[in-house]
């Protein structure tokens, strides 16, 4: 593939699973002869929810919950056809959202 980059964005709620998947992608790409830029940690998106503790009274008593979405960015520079085949066959952990752009 001539002068193309593959940009991979990974998202997960658990940063350990995300880092393991990132390492797996980097090792696969390097093994097949491609250069890798990254992993670049992107800002963590924190979504907070505030709810009343009681269903009836006591508005002042509240509880807060949050969901943290961790993100990583990888650029694979000058991928070979073997790199693309290996990445297509790669089986990543459940819970990791992968978005690929050419």
From Swiss-Prot:
One of its GO terms (molecular function) is tRNA binding. GO terms for biological process: translation. The keyword Disulfide bond does not apply. It comes from the Bacteria. One of its GO terms (cellular component) is ribonucleoprotein complex. Keywords: Ribonucleoprotein, Ribosomal protein. NCBIfam families: PRK00596.1, rpsJ_bact. Part of the 30S ribosomal subunit. Belongs to the universal ribosomal protein uS10 family. Involved in the binding of tRNA to the ribosomes. This is Small ribosomal subunit protein uS10. It comes from Granulibacter bethesdensis (strain ATCC BAA-1260 / CGDNIH1). The gene is rpsJ.
